[in-house]
Structure formats: C-alpha cells, structure tokens
From Swiss-Prot:
Gene name per UniProt: glgB
Keywords from the named record: Carbohydrate metabolism, Glycogen biosynthesis, Glycogen metabolism, Glycosyltransferase, Transferase
Matches recorded under InterPro entries: A-amylase/branching_C, Branching_enzy, GlgB, GlgB_N, GlgB_N_E_set_prok, Glyco_hydro_13_cat_dom, Glyco_hydro_13_N, Glyco_hydro_b
GO BP term, example: glycogen biosynthetic process
Pathway, per record: Glycan biosynthesis; glycogen biosynthesis
Pfam families: Alpha-amylase, Alpha-amylase_C, CBM_48, GlgB_N
Enzyme class: transferase
Oligomer and partners: Monomer.
Protein name as annotated: 1,4-alpha-glucan branching enzyme GlgB
One term under GO cellular component: cytosol
Length: 712
C-alpha cells in the first residue's frame, strides 16, 4: 500500500472536515490528480469528457483510489462493484451550492427564504441531476449525508463547511423520495445520534424518523381563499380541528388528507364556519402531544399522507370559501435524539442553561431567539406555510411562555434580562419581526396569539409598541363565562360581574372568543359536561351560552365536537361521537350552531365592528336577580343593529321591557328556545313593535337568548 497522508486517513475514517480539499480533481505539482473514495468498489476509472480513460489505483483496502489525467476537465467515475460496472458522477467535482450573497444573508439572519436554500433540494448542477443538501452545524467537526443513495454509510458523502457553519453537498443521482439523515461528529469528537433534517419537507411515519427528499417546487399551489376573509370587519368563525380524530374509519384508522378533503371542508361550510384551524400539522413523534411538540417544522405530518395530499386538503377548503389557519409552535420543541436538541453537539437551537432552555411544565426545550440563525429559521418557517401551502393564518401557540423569562418557574429558577426584568426581550423582537414579515409579504394573511396574560397591545401594530398580531385569544372571557354558566342558576346573581367584566377590556385587543381543545381535556369535562342541572337545563344552558358567545363582540372559535354537544372529553385516539346526532337533543345543538354561524355572517351588526367599542352598547346590566343581560350590536350602517337579550335563568319572563336604539318593528331573527333546537318554543311570535319611547315589551324564554333586528 502507498504511504498515506493524515488527510487520506481522515477520509477513510470518516472524520475529514473538508473533503473537497482531498477528494475530487486537484493540481498536484502540475499534474491533474483524481482521488475518489468508493468502499466496496474493486476497480475505478476516471472517464473524461474528451474520451480519456484514466485508471485509478486502489491505495487503501477501504476503497481509496487515486490516479492522474492529462489535464483539468469534466469527468465521471466508472466503478466496478462485483460483476457490475456503473458510471458515477463524483460529488467532489462540483462547485458550491450556496452563493456568497446567501452566506452574507445567512450570517445576518436575514434570509427570508431559508427554505429555498437549506434542507434537501432536487436540482441540476453542471447538467447533472441530483440533490443539494445544506444544514447548519457550526460546532460540528464533520457532517455527512447518509441515506438510501449511499447505503447509510457516513464515509461516502462527507459535506464541506462554508461560512457561518453551514455544511453543503450536491449528491448526483439522489432524487425525490430518497430517505436521508445527517451523521454528525460533535466538537469533542463524539458521534451524535443520526439527525433528521430541520428543514425537511417530509418525514417518515413515526416511529421511524428519517427525512424524505421532496421537490417542493413541484407541489401544486392551492387556489387562494377570498382576499378579505381575515379582515376585522368580516365575519370570522373558526372551526378548530384535530385531523387525526375529527372522524375515523370503521377500523379506527385515520382519514387521509385526501379523504378529509372530501368530507371536512363541505361539512364546515354547511355549518356556516368561515375558517378552519388545524391543530399543528408539522411532523411530530408523539401522537399524544397533538402536534404541539414538533420535530419537523417544514413537513406536514406523514400520518395522513404526503405534502401533495396536504395541498389537496388546503385547496378543498379554499374551494368551499374557507380560510385555513394552522396552529404554529415556535415556543418550544421536544428533546428526541433525532431532533433539534444538541444538534451539532452543542445547544444550537436551544439555550445551554436549563434555566433558559428547558420548559419545566412540558419537559421540552426552548428556542434561543437571540441567536440570529434560530430566529431566521423560525421566521422563515412562518413564511413557508403561507407561501408553499397557501395557508391564510397562523395561530401562535403558548405566546405567554415565550414572553416571560419566569414563566412557570420557581423563584431563583430563571435568569433576568439585561435590565433585570422578566420580559424575554429576544422573544419580543422575534414575534414583532415575524408579524412584520408575515403582513409585509402576505397582507391578506393574519396571525393570532394564544396569550393568557394581560400583556398590552398584543394585536396592535409594532410601530406603536405592539407585538403586531392580527388577533389575540380572549382567554379571560373564556374562563369567566364558563365559570358563570357552570353555576347553578340560583347562584348566578352573585356572579353577575363575571359576564360584565369582559366588556371592560373587550376592545383593548382584536379578540377571538375561544372555546378550544384545551377546554375539553384533562378533567375539565366537555362544554356540555360543565352545564349544571338535569338534561333539559344542561342543553338549554348550552344553547344559551353558545348564543351569548355569538352575540358577544369578538371573533368566534369552536373546537370540533362542541357543535354536536359531545358528552365526553376529547380523545385524540378516537373519532368524535357522531352517533349522538341520532338523538334530537344533540342534533338540535348542531342546528343551533349552524344557524348562529349563518346569522353571524348575514347580520353586519354582529361582525362588522367586532373589535370596536363603537359597535357595542349595553342595554341591561343590573338585572342580576333575574340573570338577564341585554345589549345592542351595531354595524357601519345606522340601521345595522341587532339587540341581544340573554336569560340565564330557568324562568320565563313576560312583559320584559328593553329600550332599543330605533323605533318601529323589530324582528326576532333568532331564538335559542326554538323547538328546532330542542327548546320549549317560548318567544315573541316573530316580531315586536317598539313603544313611542322606543321600548320593546318582550317574552324572555327560559335559559335562552333572543336576537332582534329592526324591520328594513
């Protein structure tokens, strides 16, 4: 054997940090030298474009070959494996993938289209088909691509490191559909678990964890939703859906994206919803996380099909006129060995200090928003879903956990910011910039924050000090009102303020009223399960509460199953209890939600000024003894008015007087006590005439709400 250099041994042992320095074509003392590493090959030749064939000598039994050609030229390798001879392109003859400008933007953390450069991209280089791989691992000693194309041999395709710690390699003949991972040696020479690609566009079905090459430029682009569908003056009624448990096959198997596309959008449209919000669809290893612990932020989960199939689902929603929102999780990630944690042998995506980098409640890792590469990665992910899949909005999960350094931490268990405060300044900057970029690139899209504290101006523009979200979930409204309706009616007069209090701050943000998945799990019971009394009272209570919600200022969100009054808590491992609709009580609730949605959409007074104080006036606030509330909703037109009267007691009230803003005849356009919904059919015979002093003399049905609008 020829005496080998340390570089040659580094190639053989799979630990060379810059294989292009040794492999490929090089000028050595005026000679054109070709070196190749092909384990299992018994013979290798270099075949030049000019027809020259140069034999390469085997200089090590591991598969290291070298030889000379007459001069620099394009070439390919002709290798013999057993009885088989094949021509191969040499990955180490190609120029870099990333440009200097790419590296400049990556170094600044300003590459808005990170998904065009990082990850795995089918491409043609120098006339050769293959896949370009790029990954961030600044502290790694060596990174290799392993996959179907090299028998998962880390010595076959070590990558080259570019500026700022980005590793890249073009692998000829790799193709869409190939499975792959990154094999990384850490800064101390330690061999890390194989890592999935943080930028992968698809991944294997759990429990397998390989990434899958996708030519995402060939993905079909879903048709757009109506451009004004997210605006503040439009009706926004959101159907929140967990794709794995909305409906299942007879064998309890999931519906695929395409099967969901055939059923879900048409159902949501028939029910009157304007939006569908999917619980996180990014790839995640644990079903029980519901998607809130993702490992593949750029990959729709393979549980239900391919990226193309997910496109079909989004397109089907848009075809029905529905906007699609995704739950987006930039707040934390799991520490599964194949994931982002300790990615290059150091805390790359997370904080090194567990007082900053580990979430105590969930056992997950927290992103280091102060690291430009990490913030760039997350912002780019937000833009990716909007551009590549035509998503119309992002609901950002667990914003409070991002904003506060001491979130769910004991005294002494957190690190203050540079001013000594508890605010996470880097997270604030990240959220603001994300919203600026989302609205800047996709003005028709929106964002919504699940923020459970009193942080100010969450849904106000960044230039006036806000966080820049389009909407904020009104968690306070949800907690107060559910607590109120959970009381026995005889005690509600002592809790009257829990209904009134929400209007003190109802217009401080652009609020969404959420009855979400979080309210029907972990022993909280279903929404119906929270209602007191016998069956009649429970269902009447629920009808009144839903009606109260749709009459209240704010956009609406209802988790799947709430619309059919599911009795049990939500279980992600099984379908909703659709069989309940065979019982008139449950079918009545479904009919109620359908009619409330259509009423909300068709009455401008109920949605045009959802987020403006000018769109609301109290009419009755002091009738605690009878558990009655009344208010008027107002649209832009002076006759766009809707009076809502809610009776949260089981009593019928006759001759109940309510002063209204306009004289004349008022039509009762909705009554939750209608027998159509399972009620007792007490009401106002369709219309009421206002007296000279603009008062209506009403019959208030028990545990019910009535909506009245002026005659045109």
């Amino acid at each position: 054997m020829t005496h080998l250099s340390p570089e040659a041994f580094a190639i053989i042992e799979g630990r060379h940090a810059d294989p292009f320095r040794y492999l490929g074509q090089h000028d050595v003392d005026g000679r054109t030298v070709i070196r190749a590493f092909l384990p299992e090959a018994s013979r290798v030749e270099a075949v030049g474009d000019n027809g020259e064939v140069a034999p390469l000598a085997r200089i090590h039994d591991a598969g290291l070959f070298t030889g000379t050609m007459s001069g620099p030229q394009r070439y390919r390798l002709r290798a013999t494996f057993g009885d088989h001879v094949t021509d191969l392109e040499d990955p180490y003859r190609f120029l870099p993938i990333l440009t200097d400008f790419d590296l400049h933007l990556l170094g600044e953390g300003n590459h808005e289209r990170l998904y065009d450069k990082l990850g795995a991209h089918p491409m043609v280089l120098d006339g050769v088909d293959g896949v370009g791989f790029v990954v961030l691992a600044p502290n790694a000693r060596r990174v290799s691509v392993v996959g179907d194309f090299n028998f998962w041999n880390a010595r076959r395709h070590p990558m080259r490191v570019r500026g700022n710690g980005y590793w890249e390699l073009f692998i000829p003949r790799a193709k869409a559909g190939d499975h792959y991972k990154f094999d990384i040696i850490g800064p101390q020479g330690e061999h890390l678990p194989l890592k999935s690609d943080p930028m992968a566009f698809a991944a294997e079905m759990r429990p397998k964890t390989a990434s899958i090459v996708v030519d995402e430029t060939r993905l079909p682009r879903p048709r757009p939703a109506p451009s004004d569908i997210n605006k503040l003056d439009r009706p926004v009624s959101i159907y929140e859906v967990h794709l794995g448990s909305w409906r299942r096959k007879d064998n309890n198997q999931w519906l695929t994206y395409r099967e969901l596309a055939e059923q879900l959008p048409a159902y949501a449209r028939d029910m009157g919803f304007t939006h569908i919000e999917f619980l996180p669809v990014s790839e995640h290893p644990f079903d029980g996380s519901w998607g809130y612990q993702p490992t593949g932020l750029f990959a729709p989960t393979s549980r239900f099909g391919s990226p193309e199939d997910f496109c079909a689902l989004v397109d089907a929603c848009h075809r029905e006129g529905l906007a699609v929102w995704l739950d987006w999780v930039p707040g934390h990630f799991p520490d599964d060995p194949h994931g982002l944690g300790h990615f290059d042998g150091t805390a790359l995506y997370e904080h090194a200090n567990p007082m900053q980098g580990r979430h105590l409640d969930w056992g997950t890792l927290i992103y280091n928003y102060g690291r430009t590469e990490v913030a760039n990665f997350l912002r780019s992910n937000a833009l990716f879903w909007l551009e590549r899949y035509g998503i119309d909005g992002l609901r950002v999960d667990a914003v409070a956990s991002m904003l506060y350094l001491d979130y769910s931490r004991p005294s002494g268990g957190w690190i203050p910011n540079k001013y000594g405060g508890r605010e996470n300044l880097e997270a604030i900057e990240f959220l603001r910039r994300t919203n600026i970029e989302v609205f800047g690139h996709f003005p028709q899209a929106t964002t919504a924050a699940e923020e459970s504290t009193a942080w100010p101006q969450v849904s106000r523009p960044v230039d006036i000090g806000g966080l820049g979200f389009g909407y904020k979930w009104n968690m306070g409204w949800m907690h107060d009102t559910l607590r109120y309706v959970g009381k026995d009616p005889i005690h509600r007069k002592y809790h009257h303020g829990e209904i009134l209090f929400g209007l003190h701050y109802a217009f401080s943000e652009n609020f969404i009223l959420p009855l979400s998945h979080d309210e029907v799990v972990h022993g909280k019971r279903s929404i119906l399960g929270r209602m007191p009394g016998d069956d009649w009272q429970r269902f009447a209570n629920l009808r009144a509460y839903y009606s109260f919600m749709f009459g209240h200022p704010g956009k609406k969100l209802l988790f799947m199953g709430c619309e059919i009054a599911q009795e049990r808590e939500w279980n992600h491992d099984s379908s909703l209890d659709w069989h309940l609709l065979g019982d008139a009580k449950y079918a009545g609730i479904q009919a109620l939600i359908r009619d409330l949605n259509h009423l909300y959409r068709n009455q401008p007074a109920l949605h045009e000024r959802d987020c403006e104080p000018e769109g609301f006036d109290w009419l009755i606030t002091e009738d605690a003894d009878r558990n009655v509330f009344a208010w008027v909703r107002k649209g832009f037109d002076e006759r766009a008015r809707c009076v809502v009267v809610v009776n949260f007691s089981p009593n019928v009230y006759y001759n109940y007087r309510v002063r209204v803003p306009l004289g004349g005849t008022w039509r009762e356009v909705f009554n939750s006590d209608s027998s159509h919904y399972g009620g007792s059919n007490v009401g106002n015979v369709g219309q009421v005439h206002a007296s000279e002093d603009q008062q209506l003399n009403l019959i208030l049905p028990p545990m019910a709400a009535v909506f009245l609008v002026p005659e045109a």
